[in-house]
Amino acid sequence: MAEPYLIEKLQSVEQTFQDLTRRLADPEIATDPREFQRVARMRSSMEELVTTYEEWKQRDAELKGAREILRESSGDPELREMAALEVNELEALLVSLEERLKILLLPRDPNDDKNIMLEIRAGTGGDEASLWAGDLLRMYSRYAESQGWRVKLLSESTGELGGYKEAILEIQGESVYSKLKFEAGVHRVQRVPATEAGGRVHTSTATVAIMPEVDEVEVSIDPKDIELTTARSGGAGGQNVNKVETAVDLFHKPTGIRIFCTEERSQLQNRERAMQILRAKLYEMKLQEQQEAVSSMRRSQVGTGSRSEKIRTYNYKDNRATDHRLGLNFSLNPVLEGEIEEVIQACISKDQTEQLAQMAQDQEAAKV
C-alpha cells in the first residue's frame, strides 16, 4: 500500500487536473489564446502522472479482489494457485507503479526544456589543456548529433597548438538542458601529450559550464553597464573579412564578463549574439547562487553543477572514464566519441533517488 502522504499528493494533483480539464472545456477561455495555452500546458504536464495514478488505482482494486479470492479458495487448490500467482504479479506491478509515481511527483526543473549554451574553458595544463578542451567540444558535438539536436559554434578562442582556450556552443533541441546540466564542472584528463617527448603522463583540466538560454524578460541588463567595441573579423563574412568591423567585443562592468563574437556575418548580429551569451551567463550565475543555497540543505552526491566541482577523470592509459559522482567507470573510447547517454542516465537516476530520499525524510520530519 502506498504511503498516506503519497495518496494525498496524488489526489490533489488529480483534482487539479480535473479542474484544468473543465477550464479548457469552458467556451470563455477560447477568447484568450494565451490563457488557453497556459492552462493546456499545465494540464499536459500532469497527464502522465494522472494516467499512471489511474492505472495504480485499477491494479490496487484488482489486488484486493485477488486477495479475496485467495482467502476464499481453500477448497480449490487450482483456483488458489491461480489467485496466489495473480497476487504476486499485482504486488510487483504496484511497487513498480508506486516508484514511478514518486518520480513523477518530484518537482520539475523549470529549465529542463530549454536550449543551452555550453561553454568549455581550458584549465590547468597549458597547450595540452586547450587540446583537451577541443576533444570535449568534439565529444559534446557528437553526442548532440546522436540526440538529433542542432549545434552551432558561437564563440571561440583557439589554442596555439590547436584546440580551444575557450569555446561556446549553442545546442538546440528537445530537453537539452535536462540531460546536459549534469556535465557542468571540471573534466580532468590523464594522458601523454602529443608535445611530450619523454612519454610522461600529464594531468590537464577543462571546465564545462551549462547555461540555459534566457530571454530579455528573465534577465535585465542596464545598457550603462555595457562597454562595447568593434573590430575586424577573421571569421565568416566573405568579401567583408578584414574590411568591415563586424566583430564585437562586449564587456559587462559589474561582473567583469567579456565576450568576443566573430561568428555572425554582421556587426548587429554579433552584438545580438554577444548579448544573448551575456544573458545566459548572468542567468547561470543566478542559478549557481540558488543551487548553492539548496545544496547547503541537501548535499547532492550527483553534483551541484558548480564550475569548481571535479566530476570526471579521463584516463587514457587505462582506457577508462571515471565519474566521481557515481563512483562508476566507463570505457574511454566510446565516451570520447560522444556515447555518454549511459553516463547521463545514471546521473539522472541517482539525482531522482536522492530527491526521493529527501522527500521521505521531509515527510518523517513533518510527523514529529
Curated annotation (Swiss-Prot):
The GO terms describing molecular function are: translation release factor activity, codon specific
Q: Which SUPFAM superfamilies match?
A: Release factor
What is the protein's known function? Peptide chain release factor 1 directs the termination of translation in response to the peptide chain termination codons UAG and UAA.
What PROSITE patterns does the record tag this protein with? Answer: RF_PROK_I
* Homology family: Belongs to the prokaryotic/mitochondrial release factor family.
HAMAP family, per this entry? Rel_fac_1
Record flagged with keyword NADP:
no
Question: For this UniProt entry, what's an example GO CC term?
Answer: cytoplasm
Q: Which UniProt keywords apply?
A: Cytoplasm, Methylation, Protein biosynthesis
Q: Which InterPro entries match?
A: PCRF, Pep_chain_release_fac_I, Pep_chain_release_fac_I_sf, Prokaryotic/Mito_RF, RF-1
> What is the name of the protein in this document?
Peptide chain release factor 1
Main subcellular localisation: cytoplasm
Q: Which organism is it from?
A: Synechococcus elongatus (strain ATCC 33912 / PCC 7942 / FACHB-805) (Anacystis nidulans R2)
Where is this chain's protein located in or outside the cell? Cytoplasm
Q: Does the keyword Cytoplasm apply?
A: yes
Instruction: List the SMART domains hit by this protein, alphabetically.
Output: PCRF (SM00937)
Q: How is it modified after translation?
A: Methylated by PrmC. Methylation increases the termination efficiency of RF1.
Q: List modified residues, type N5-methylglutamine.
A: Q239
Taxonomic classification, please?
A: Bacteria, Bacillati, Cyanobacteriota, Cyanophyceae, Synechococcales
